From Swiss-Prot:
Protein name: Large ribosomal subunit protein bL21
Family: Belongs to the bacterial ribosomal protein bL21 family.
Role played: This protein binds to 23S rRNA in the presence of protein L20.
Keywords recorded for this protein, A-Z: Ribonucleoprotein, Ribosomal protein, RNA-binding, rRNA-binding
Originating organism: Mycolicibacterium smegmatis (strain ATCC 700084 / mc(2)155)
Summary of subunit composition and partner proteins: Part of the 50S ribosomal subunit. Contacts protein L20.
Length: 103
């Protein structure tokens, strides 16, 4: 069974293994830079590590590949019989990471 970790970034949790490519909310790092991600859980075969003392020894490193944008979402507010309507759009800024190792 392969080793994987649950990492927290941008208010979300992601399941990652070494070599995975993950899109996360924008990080303030340049492409090509190495970042360390905070770990919530590590599974290594039958061993599950979730204690804070043990997780302090674990590091998940990733390389920033690029910054990109997510798909456009459209928000439309409408109130019946008053003529009120409002349109708004949003594209989330994302960072593409490649996980280089779980140590």
């Amino acid at each position: 069974m392969a080793t994987y970790a649950i990492v927290k970034t941008g208010g979300k949790q992601y399941k990652v293994a070494a070599g995975d490519v993950v899109k996360v909310e924008k990080l303030d790092s340049e492409p090509g830079a190495s970042v360390s991600l905070p770990v919530a859980l590590v599974v290594d075969g039958a061993n599950v590590t979730s204690k804070a003392d043990d997780l302090a020894k674990v590091a998940v490193t990733a390389e920033v590949l690029e910054h990109t944008k997510g798909p456009k979402i459209r928000i439309h507010k409408f109130k019946n019989k008053t003529g009120y309507h409002k349109r708004q759009g949003h594209r989330q800024q994302l960072t593409v990471l490649k996980v280089t190792g779980i140590k």
